[in-house]
Amino acid sequence: MKEVTAVVRPNKMSVTKDALDKIGYRRMTAIPVLGKGKQRGISGELNFYIQPKLLAKRYSTGMKYIPKRLLSIVVNDEDVDQVIKTIIGVNQTAQIGDGKIFVESIDEVIRIRTGEKGELALK
């Protein structure tokens, strides 16, 4: 099993959720987060035109964090590529700030309510 963690734009959350639902992944954890990357907190992420004076002020006062959504999905090993392709497919705009995907191994999953383990706990 793998945990696929994706950091995506908030305005892409609905289409991401719908696309994952279509391939059978309805269960996920979504957390509002703040972050900064190559866009240094000044991209079109906030949907306003940045004037040169504002840009200079932004850099002189430090970087601002941009709202993002962090998605965590635990998937079977054989589904990892499909989940990644799905997330990329609906989030890729070719612009800085599209996000990142991280994949980590999961040793065990246990459903608290029933005590089921492994793949049974994911169903």
UniProtKB/Swiss-Prot annotation:
The keyword Transcription regulation applies. One of its GO terms (biological process) is nitrogen fixation. PROSITE patterns: PII_GLNB_CTER, PII_GLNB_DOM. InterPro entries: N-reg_PII (IPR002187), N-reg_PII-like_a/b (IPR011322), N-reg_PII/ATP_PRibTrfase_C (IPR015867), N-reg_PII_CS (IPR017918). The keyword Transcription regulation applies. One of its GO terms (molecular function) is ATP binding. One of its GO terms (cellular component) is cytosol. Keywords: Nitrogen fixation, Transcription, Transcription regulation. Belongs to the P(II) protein family. Could be involved in the regulation of nitrogen fixation. This is Nitrogen fixation nifHD1 region GlnB-like protein 2. It comes from Methanosarcina barkeri. The gene is glnBB.
